[in-house]
């Protein structure tokens, strides 16, 4: 997302056009190019390429490919492999497919739905948008569904903090932010950095706010940025590299204030994001093994891998020519013996040290969308204790509406205790100063998703701590021998997004195909 945001903003500036226009044009160009490549690739697979891939380089035994992890990344990878004539076996520890792409159904009145995990899709997220189109799954435009005249509410220091006031405050740090962006360059990686980029990587977001914002982190703008980037990455801002703030906030235009730069969170899949998972799984059904967890990986002398799985009390080995690891590093580090995997020292450093954010989602349903009557679109940020909200039901039928209280870091970690009802009551007391009268419209329905307690992810999504851009960023997705890696945690541009899963799943599939056919 970040690299794409950088180039989009740069093109818009040079051409003196709106960012949305550039996004739309790129989507059309990308779709046309992808359609062309898809037709050529599938035609080749149907004639000369597929037999070569199935038979392997030498024309002998088929290449044995194993994909470990049946989340969105692993399923996308296996789906693209199958289209190219490579039938991988997919192993998943959970009994459910999809990982963090998982829709809530049946919990709310009027048939309304919510997402357990990944929810919003940017306009620039072309990989997942094109996959959804290929699977004939329409997307709903969340921004177009917002009632005219509604806007985001900020509430800090005991009072409303208006959008014009926030824009004025941002103007005060504009030159500093853009000078940092220019001098840092994008991206900053373990093998690519400038002096300023390396310097900022050694600072935290909190440090940079205190240095650049008048009044520091105790000012209204400072508090807003602290809350926004806490929930964005699921960690306290004093733990995160300052570059994570710069590479989003830096892509605003003069007089504009988008907290997350070019990220506009415009779409979601109509009827639930996990329909992508379902559609992929139908195509791959005979290849998927569930309830089977990876416990060890060993690189053999011939370059093959022996991977050890556990299914209940049974442990067994599988030998593969190619292994795609499509599960979070938090799981690899915690649950898998990699002492004989033969990975590079830098890869092992990333596996051990890449941080996993803590985010929780409290979805609360109301009998009507009272926030719209107040002039609010459902998006709020505040320092009253709940952190942030957005409306889950934009574009949904019915009079009821759902707000999600989205928390990160220390606050998110507290959601491992309490009931949905008690947490909803707490939230309503905290949000009442921002949306007065809301409490009276709660219909008694609420759900909690506590991602730090999820045994299959051990957190919400990845982020880089102070110093980690220059320490190992960029190695996460790099091929290591005959091992390939995918998942949002291996994406530079779309870390933390469903897009990151799809984009890297396709990348890993491309690597395998190139090697097998090479």
Q: Model-found features: residue ranges?
A:
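Generic structural signal for small/hydrophobic residues in well-ordered secondary structure
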Residues: 72, 98, 132, 209, ...
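Central helical "cap/lid" subdomain
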Residues: 298-299, 310-373
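N-terminal export signals
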Residues: 29, 34-57
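Conserved flavin/dinucleotide-binding core of flavoenzymes
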Residues: 84, 304, 310, 335, ...
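N-terminal secretory signal peptides
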Residues: 1-32
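N-terminal glycine-rich phosphate/pyrophosphate-binding loop and immediately adjacent elements
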Residues: 61-186
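Mobile amphipathic helical/loop "lid" adjacent to a hydrophobic cofactor/ligand pocket
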Residues: 2-13, 133-135, 140-248
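Active-site/ligand-binding neighborhood in enzyme catalytic cores
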Residues: 20, 189-296, 311, 319, ...
